[in-house]
């Protein structure tokens, strides 16, 4: 069926092309398609922003010079049900490892530390009404702040996901 459609399209394209330029030959397979050929789009780590981690369990992903910051799954599990988030104001300038807020749960409170230097450009307003998003979706909807990066080379000092997993195993032992 697909080959029939391709041949029909090719024939239509050739007839249109021939009408506008009769001297030009139409190749039998102008797009070099073979029967059964399928073009796929792959998504994977190479196409996605890489998540980096700190020893204090914050993570950051970057896109176009903007970092999105949150806490790791390990941290949210250790905290328990988050009931309150204290976040900085937009425009706050942070240096790497500066304290920028806190999360409170029924079990404990934990300070938040900036993984990189930069300026806060956005805070997750949804956490004011629903701080439990940190527990439900710590890597997606439960992000904390977005920030510009004043020194992107600091990313190199953070742990990859694999290194972070090894780090967690080492502190659990």
Swiss-Prot record:
Primary site of residence: mitochondrion
InterPro entries, per database record: 2-oxoA_DH_lipoyl-BS (IPR003016), Biotin_lipoyl (IPR000089), GCV_H (IPR002930), GCV_H/Fam206 (IPR033753), GCV_H_sub (IPR017453), Single_hybrid_motif (IPR011053)
Cofactor: (R)-lipoate
Highest taxon, organism lineage: Eukaryota
One GO term (biological process): glycine decarboxylation via glycine cleavage system
Cofactor binding annotation: Binds 1 lipoyl cofactor covalently.
All residue ranges annotated as the Lipoyl-binding domain in the record: 66-148
Alphabetical keyword list: Lipoyl, Mitochondrion, Transit peptide
Record-listed N6-lipoyllysine modification sites: 107
Transit peptide feature range: 1-48
GO cellular component terms, semicolon-separated: glycine cleavage complex; mitochondrion
Localization per Swiss-Prot or TrEMBL: Mitochondrion
Assembly with partners or alone: The glycine cleavage system is composed of four proteins: P (GLDC), T (GCST), L (DLD) and H (GCSH). Interacts with GLDC.
The protein's role, per its UniProt record: The glycine cleavage system catalyzes the degradation of glycine. The H protein (GCSH) shuttles the methylamine group of glycine from the P protein (GLDC) to the T protein (GCST). Has a pivotal role in the lipoylation of enzymes involved in cellular energetics such as the mitochondrial dihydrolipoyllysine-residue acetyltransferase component of pyruvate dehydrogenase complex (DLAT), and the mitochondrial dihydrolipoyllysine-residue succinyltransferase component of 2-oxoglutarate dehydrogenase complex (DLST).
Protein name: Glycine cleavage system H protein, mitochondrial
Species this protein is from: Oryctolagus cuniculus (Rabbit)
Upper taxonomic lineage: Eukaryota, Metazoa, Chordata, Craniata, Vertebrata
